[in-house]
């Protein structure tokens, strides 16, 4: 559900302070964060964030297309494990063939 327009976008204040400090000094360092729910603002473009996925930190380089999305959208929390093809073929084959 979208956030109310009168409230504005949510950005963790400490994260915003770190980005502002890096923008003033023109540095490009990786910013480590647990704040997956912070919305990406135009100030974040060009920075790399290490977003925690519950197990490890995933590096996310922010581009202009990501503005308005949340940081957590780009650091998946679940790993997809495929079904092995041999087991799938066994299930499809009918007994007696």
UniProtKB/Swiss-Prot annotation:
PROSITE patterns per record: RIBOSOMAL_S19
InterPro entries: Ribosomal_uS19 (IPR002222), Ribosomal_uS19_bac-type (IPR005732), Ribosomal_uS19_CS (IPR020934), Ribosomal_uS19_SF (IPR023575)
Key words, A-Z: Ribonucleoprotein, Ribosomal protein, RNA-binding, rRNA-binding
Gene Ontology molecular function: rRNA binding; structural constituent of ribosome
A biological-process GO annotation: ribosomal small subunit assembly
Cited Pfam families: Ribosomal_S19 (PF00203)
Superkingdom of this protein's organism: Bacteria
CC annotations in GO: cytoplasm; small ribosomal subunit
Function: Protein S19 forms a complex with S13 that binds strongly to the 16S ribosomal RNA.
Entry's family note: Belongs to the universal ribosomal protein uS19 family.
Stated name of the protein: Small ribosomal subunit protein uS19
Native source species: Salinibacter ruber (strain DSM 13855 / M31)
């Amino acid at each position: 559900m979208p956030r109310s327009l009168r409230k504005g976008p949510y950005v963790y204040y400490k994260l915003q302070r770190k980005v502002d400090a890096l923008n003033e000094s023109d540095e490009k360092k990786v910013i480590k964060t647990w704040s997956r729910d912070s919305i990406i603002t135009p100030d974040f473009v060009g920075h790399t964030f290490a977003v925690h996925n519950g197990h490890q930190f995933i590096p996310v380089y922010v581009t202009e297309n990501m503005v308005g999305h949340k940081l957590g959208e780009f650091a998946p929390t679940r790993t997809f494990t495929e079904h092995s093809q041999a087991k799938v073929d066994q299930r499809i084959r009918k007994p007696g063939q």
